[in-house]
A protein has these predicted regions:
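Nucleic-acid nuclease catalytic cores
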Residues: 90-121
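Short, conserved beta-strand edge motifs with alternating hydrophobic and charged residues
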Residues: 28-30, 65-68, 102
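Acidic-basic catalytic patches of nuclease active cores, encompassing PD-(D/E)XK
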Residues: 1-45
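Conserved catalytic cores of phosphodiester-cleaving nucleases, focusing on short active-site segments
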Residues: 54-56, 61-73
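Mg2+/Mn2+-dependent nuclease catalytic core
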Residues: 71-91
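Basic/aromatic recognition patch in beta-strand/loop cores that engages polyanionic ligands
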Residues: 45-57
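Short, electropositive alpha-helical surface patch
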Residues: 114-135
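Charged phosphate-binding loop/patch that engages nucleotide di/tri-phosphates or the phosphate backbone
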Residues: 1, 132-164
Length: 164
């Protein structure tokens, strides 16, 4: 569970805020205290419009996968995956604030994992059971019904386009 602590100060926060502004998202807060973390923390940013807040975590400026579930209160419950469960993706937090994004889309009531290369629809049952694996996702570019989502993302955040 996230523990509220004093906010990080310094160059990392400045770079995160710069990236957030670049992508048109609102920087909410960055905590320095998170269960299971050393020299790490949690970032919460907000995308205006129909997209809910998303949260991702970092350790020593590396973005890490987490286990998660969407709660009735509208919050994401996050917890670190063990090394054996981790999905093998890490990216510099500073270089791309949107590299891993967990999004609940109000339009279609679906969950998506976004990064700079592709968009994955997440299996809600797996989220509810807090067991997530790439095998439980669907490459969104293969689903015709998601064109509206792609257009929205490409127009607002330039995440789709030729990167898929």
């Amino acid at each position: 569970k996230a523990k509220k602590g004093k906010e990080f100060e310094g160059s990392l926060v400045s770079k995160i805020k710069t990236q957030a502004k670049k992508y048109g998202v609102q920087f909410v807060r960055l905590y320095d205290s998170f269960s299971g973390f050393t020299k790490g923390g949690m970032v919460q940013v907000r995308i205006p419009g129909q997209w809910s807040d998303f949260i991702f975590m970092f350790k020593e400026s590396k973005c890490c996968f987490v286990e998660f579930k969407y709660t009735e209160s509208g919050n994401f419950h996050l917890g670190m995956l063990s090394d054996s469960q981790r999905l093998g993706f890490e990216s510099s937090l500073v270089n791309d604030i949107l590299y891993f994004v967990l999004v609940f889309c109000d339009i279609e009531k679906k969950y998506y994992m976004l990064n700079s290369k592709r968009i994955l629809e997440l299996n809600p049952k797996k989220i509810a059971s807090r067991r997530f694996n790439l095998k439980d996702t669907f490459p969104a570019e293969s689903l015709e019904s998601h064109k509206e989502i792609f257009q929205f993302l490409n127009k607002n955040y330039n995440l789709v386009g030729n990167k898929l």
